[in-house]
Amino acid sequence: MGLVQKIFGTHSQHELKRINPIADKVESYREEYSKLTDEQLKAKTKEFKERLAKGETLDDILPEAYATVREAGKRVLGMEHYRVQIIGGIILHQGRIAEMRTGEGKTLVCTLPAYLNALEEKGVLVVTVNDYLAKRDAEWMGQIHNFLGLSVGIVLHDMKDDERRAAYACDITYVTNNELGFDYLRDNMAIYKEQLVLRDLHYCIIDEVDSVLIDEARTPLIISGQSGKSTKLYELCDVLARQLVKGTYHGERTKMQVMMQEEIEEDGDFIVNEKDKVVNLTEQGIHKVEQFFHIDNYADIENLEIQHNVTLALRAHYLMFRDKDYVIKDDEVLIVDEFTGRIMPGRRYSDGLHQAIEAKEHVKVKRESKTLATITFQNFFNKFDKKAGMTGTALTEEKEFRGIYNMDVVEVPTNRPVARIDHNDAVFKTMKGKFNAVVEEVVASHEKGQPVLVGTINIDTSELLSDMLKKRGIPHNVLNAKYHELEAEIVAEAGKHGAVTIATNMAGRGTDIKLDDEARAAGGLKIIGTERHESRRIDNQLRGRAGRQGDPGESLFYISLEDNLMRLFAQETLMNTFNKLGVGENDQIEHKLLSNAIETAQKKIETNNYGIRCHLLEYDQVMNEQREIMYAERRRVLDGESMRSSIMKMITDFVEGVVNRCVSDDKSADEWNYDEINELLLPTIPVEPVVYDENVKNKNELTHVLKEKAVKLYEDKEAMFPEPETIREIERVVLLKVIDRKWMDHIDDMDQLKQGIGLQAYGQKDPVVQYKMMGYDMFDEMTQAITEDTVRLLMHIQVEEKVEREQVAKVTGTNKDEGPSVKGPVKRTDKKIYPNDLCPCGSGKKYKNCCGRKA
């Protein structure tokens, strides 16, 4: 805490002063409400709705509503909200983020704002990170809402459209962030209004809000169809990548080097900048690529695809690592989530990176998919009228929550004081020395019966430590992406006395680790971190596994100067300093220089990652504005509005466009190029050919005459249909078909533009500005193409022609974790679940021990 905060207090402290009087008012109703009968308590819901109808606001009835939920929780679940939980509930109602420590009962907190906001009858969405939590919370907390007369729905990955629609129609709906986002995209691909499943996006409460809005912000939701693109180029570039020689990275050029115009001597064919995760070819490398592909100029725009694929192949080889970023299972490349350590089946890296890794690992290279619909979580959740979030760790990212989502973070005090002891970092010169010390610490804790959770940031480290502990005869469990099926069982055992658990970030959140009495007496759970994560927030999550609800516990991080974080981001002088001091391999180092270096390194990375997310949002904002326009137009069609006026405008706009292209103001009528006018006009609007007419003297008169003819032609077409609604439905069908086809092509075009836009920087132009300008031009071209295609199709429609709405493209999948197929407008590939498979609900249990029992 800085000096200013010590004197004036933190933002959270100021906000809590404002919130405390509201919490006092809630508590003042406790005695009165405890005397109400069940019927009287249930009747409160109807009373609140009537008061809202008469003009009272949610803020007016909040104290009584929260007191009602509190009393219902006590009667139905035997759980009464603590004061700190009421404070958390008030923060959530205000559309903010409540930071509450692990074990403080965030699930119960959620019932307060969910109930209050559901009284408006506009729907409340409680968003969780997996199906297991959505199902558990809906069935558990739903009992309170049901008791008070509200309906509770749940959306799971294998539900059909009718079930989803019914769930979203409930007062309160529990759903995962992925299912919700994909339902939004699918709704905007629907061809009939009856296929829509979502209501308007009114209010949502996001559990683990940092995971959803920060960690997943860089990965857009994508619904894809099959692309016709060949995979041969990926395999060729992989062959090339193996032949190229890695050069030396000399770091970023200093200001002095730039001023003195010093040239850095390049060696090798390419340079890898691990810090910024960038690969660049040298002059020598570019020459080799040109020879390999028999091309004259690598930088030519027609070689954009080769440029992209060569970079991907080098990234796959030198920046993506097996058993850290991905694993190979059943001849398939599966992504490992860097924040949770979990495997993400069904999810693929975009832009061809996944195919490049498949080529590198010699597994079958799957065809790249065509994007049919896409949106980022940033833009999706900003569509809600009001949103709130809960998490144990958000303060470190408050700047981002404020800047991108307009949400501030309020730290809620714990119900009981935190008894966990957080030790200073233990720093060693080498990794070997660090791991030796970790093993000694584990052995010492195990011998006195204290449970230990060792956190690692990748699979390799967890397996290395496991081997070292086996040699010392220490029984232990390993939890990483390779053994994720056993997660629930391993976490349940982790709090028992003498238990030793080695886990990747998977154990960082989710199920609580409960201590037995002997473990409590031995000092509680000891957390040992084997490396600092790039994000302080992930380190804090690991620490937070110990010391829940006043339990004893300890946390300690072991670090070496050879760790990636220190190697890439800390000062190089540190290693030299400790070498001069004669520090041995197994000597522990403690120095203020080190603590500062670690914190500075993490802050650097966090700032860098924040910059990347802001940069991505700048690009996506262009697509978002265009998406809003297209989806609004689609919704008009689905809502069954008459599109006649829009069609008439398209007809007249098209005519005007043709005349403007072919006729200049300074030429007389006998000089006009009538062949060109007919060439552009007649294939779309088959009127009589345009010829010289002495009565038509200028451009405006020609435009007026041709508009009248075109409108008359369309009116004659309308008259051919005995039922007016027939032609209205045909207009809707044609518009939907054309909009969808052109929009899908436009998504691809914008993606191609984004991939190549970086080259604009070489011409001293801002790539983002250029992307916006070119993107808007492309959007304008697309809308003109929609006008032309729609008019042409309608002008040539025949009365006997059968016209039905149909999907423009077949959906083949999404980029997120998926279970069995969902029937309806979106088709997913159905996969058989075997008894020993991980249950698709996300519980971490085997299918036979979970949902398979009920099957």
Which stretches of residues belong to each language-model region?
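Extended, charged helical/alpha-beta scaffold domains that provide interaction surfaces
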Residues: 326-334, 340-347, 549-550, 557, ...
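Active-site-adjacent structural elements in folded domains
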Residues: 110, 438, 824-826, 834
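Conserved P-loop NTPase motor core
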Residues: 1-582, 631-632, 648-649, 653
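Hydrophobic, well-ordered secondary-structure elements that form the walls
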Residues: 454, 502, 743, 779, ...
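Generic anion/oxyanion-binding catalytic loop in active/binding sites
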Residues: 30, 427, 619, 732, ...
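Short Cys/His-rich zinc-binding micro-motifs
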Residues: 829-848, 852
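Short, Lys/Glu-rich amphipathic helical modules
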Residues: 448-462, 639-641, 691-695, 840
